[in-house]
Amino acid sequence: MPLVKRNIDPRHLCHTALPRGIKNELECVTNISLANIIRQLSSLSKYAEDIFGELFNEAHSFSFRVNSLQERVDRLSVSVTQLDPKEEELSLQDITMRKAFRSSTIQDQQLFDRKTLPIPLQETYDVCEQPPPLNILTPYRDDGKEGLKFYTNPSYFFDLWKEKMLQDTEDKRKEKRKQKQKNLDRPHEPEKVPRAPHDRRREWQKLAQGPELAEDDADLLHKHIEVANGPASHYETRPQTYVDHMDGSYSLSALPFSQMSELLTRAEERVLVRPHEPPPPPPMHGAGDAKPTPTCISSATGLIENRPQSPAAGRTPVFVSPTPPPPPPPLPSALSTSSLRASMTSTPPPPVPPPPPPPATALQAPAVPPPPAPLQIAPGVLHPAPPPIAPPLVQPSPPVARAAPVCETVPVHPLPQGEVQGLPPPPPPPPLPPPGIRPSSPVAVAALAHPPSGLHPAPSTAPGPHAPLMPPSPPSQVLPASEPKRHPSTLPVISDARSVLLEAIRKGIQLRKVEEQREQEAKHERIENDVATILSRRIAVEYSDSEDDSEFDEVDWLE
């Protein structure tokens, strides 16, 4: 509805009741009408003064702004036209440190505030009736709301609009955050190859060469891809042979010796520089030699390499000798010739097989479940190592050897004196783990590293009357495998000064976090009844990707 700013009184000139006792009514009405006209003229003159006074104030402020702008233009024109760089030196610091001009535009808002209320409207407001004094009941309310707002609330509609605008702004910010997170979680799309333009001339040239010499469409597409993305990398095109399937059903260990030699000869002829020369014979190691270097065929390359086996490698190396192997050195009776031949020619077992019962010649633990099978390894593979230092919680025990493929020490009982005499004197031979476990299998490593608790490892003895059985060590002398080793703490004791410093640092971080949260909350509290600020805030959120006040995401690293 239209808002009447100025009301001219009286509105009706002749609408007056004549008093009784007046004889000349026409003269009375004329005088009343003239008086009302004079009152209207006085109201017009008063409002004219207000209107022209407002116009004068606006013109004065406008002239002041124009004069200040003219003075700035005059100063700039003088400095531009009359500046002589030879006489007056300009420092680069003055030019760079000077702030750029920034105009301050004051928007007209809060037009209906008490301070900006015009005088005619103030007079009209004063004429209105006062609302009931409901503010007297405000101190007696528990919710803290003003009692008069339940009767009349001029800011109700503005508060409703403000709440809706702020909620829309927050919803848009959350949607942007979700979209950004979705873009981060989405996998990177491959680059699309642009489609080659349709060239009829190339097609006619391809047909002109004949069907035999015409290039295939796949070759043309490959050329276009090379032009767009650069030359393709070189891929290995070697044939897939038995060497590529070491762990499958076509393992080298499952082949006869004649086929194995033929396959190795072909590999040498394809790889070596001098293919006609025979391969070098394997080094002959005696019973006392240590650290032999086996010939290893890698399943990843299919080539012959002379390098030691590494248990951490991802390949499955197979030990193959190009010539018939020499007679093996004397072994303990735990590894018989039949078990050695079975380990050289049989296929490797699956990764986690059920523990098979040990053979008749192998060791067995009486009155306990059968332990894992012993390790079946070719002669000369295990590297004897010096005995490690025994832990302080266990009584001194015989030296323990360490296997090269398995990076764990297995405490077992030493061999009898009769078996030790046939081995090199300086380091004792490596005792062999239970049968059926491969050194490269992770299950074997876990089994060797953590033997079953409550079970003692079986002593490695040879069947015969001259080999006495050693009694198992008492339980008090054996440390359980599941119990971790306890070492004295070597960390320095934190003094009171350091603890106070750490506490101060924590408090400082907490204070900084709380301070930044208060700054973020202050940003929300600054939004008062300012329409321009609310609208500009919403526009900034819609058309920008910044999330300055996004639920304190920037202080998560302090937690």
Swiss-Prot record:
Residue ranges constituting the WH2 domain according to the UniProt record: 497-514
Signal peptide start and end residues: none
Low complexity biased stretches: 333-346
Source domain of life: Eukaryota
Biased composition (Pro residues): 322-332, 347-360, 384-399, 423-437, 460-477
Skewed-composition ranges (Basic and acidic residues): 182-202
GO molecular function: actin binding; protein kinase A binding; small GTPase binding
Keywords: Actin-binding, Cell junction, Cytoplasm, Cytoskeleton, Methylation, Phosphoprotein, Synapse
Record note on quaternary structure: Component of the WAVE1 complex composed of ABI2, CYFIP1 or CYFIP2, BRK1, NCKAP1 and WASF1/WAVE1. Within the complex, a heterodimer containing NCKAP1 and CYFIP1 interacts with a heterotrimer formed by WAVE1, ABI2 and BRK1. CYFIP2 binds to activated RAC1 which causes the complex to dissociate, releasing activated WASF1. The complex can also be activated by NCK1. Binds actin and the Arp2/3 complex. Interacts with BAIAP2. Interacts with SHANK3; the interaction mediates the association of SHANK3 with the WAVE1 complex. Interacts with ABI1 (via N-terminus).
Function: Downstream effector molecule involved in the transmission of signals from tyrosine kinase receptors and small GTPases to the actin cytoskeleton. Promotes formation of actin filaments. Part of the WAVE complex that regulates lamellipodia formation. The WAVE complex regulates actin filament reorganization via its interaction with the Arp2/3 complex. As component of the WAVE1 complex, required for BDNF-NTRK2 endocytic trafficking and signaling from early endosomes. Also involved in the regulation of mitochondrial dynamics.
Protein name (Swiss-Prot/TrEMBL): Actin-binding protein WASF1
Organism placement in taxonomy: Eukaryota, Metazoa, Chordata, Craniata, Vertebrata
Gene name linked to the record: Wasf1
